[in-house]
Amino acid sequence: MIHHDPTFWLLARASGITAYVLLTCSVLAGLVVKSRPFGRKVKTASVTDVHRVFALLGLGMIALHGVALVLDQTVRMPVAALFVPFLSHYRPGAVAWGVLTAELAALITVSFSLRSRIGARNWRRLHWATYLVFLMGTVHGLTAGTDASQPWARALYLGAVGSVVFATAWRVLTRPVRPTPALERSA
């Protein structure tokens, strides 16, 4: 009987789940920056810093997740499968969601530093893709994650999706109405 050390498999699972939680927190912090549910009690700059830290830590956990999968003897993930969708022999479609999620998350995270070069409007447009990253990451976790059928994992995904939906609804419903120029003239 061949015995495989489960260390990297456990690390891959833990880092994947941790990455999902951190990226969920980043999305929520980003929504808090714009919707300001706490009014002026919490400084926008502080929440923005927290948002960035969650994003960077999440990206680090995604990288650790990929490295652990490559080093694990059970899955035997080729390095190229971390960068090219559908190269994985383990659940290729489900893993492809993760590859695309990681790449888009990296692009959005790098855009923090490029905001002045690409312009605020383009940066904001790119930032809307965060919702796509969150959705793809959720699909990846539910379809590739070996713990996805566990009650605690289902509760985690449901809580994350519910929180993002609620925070998004809050942002949309509490957005101040800006008068149009025509309305301003008639007033």
Provide a role label for each language-model segment.
Residues 1-187:
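Membrane-embedded alpha-helical bundles that constitute the cytochrome b-like, heme-associated redox core
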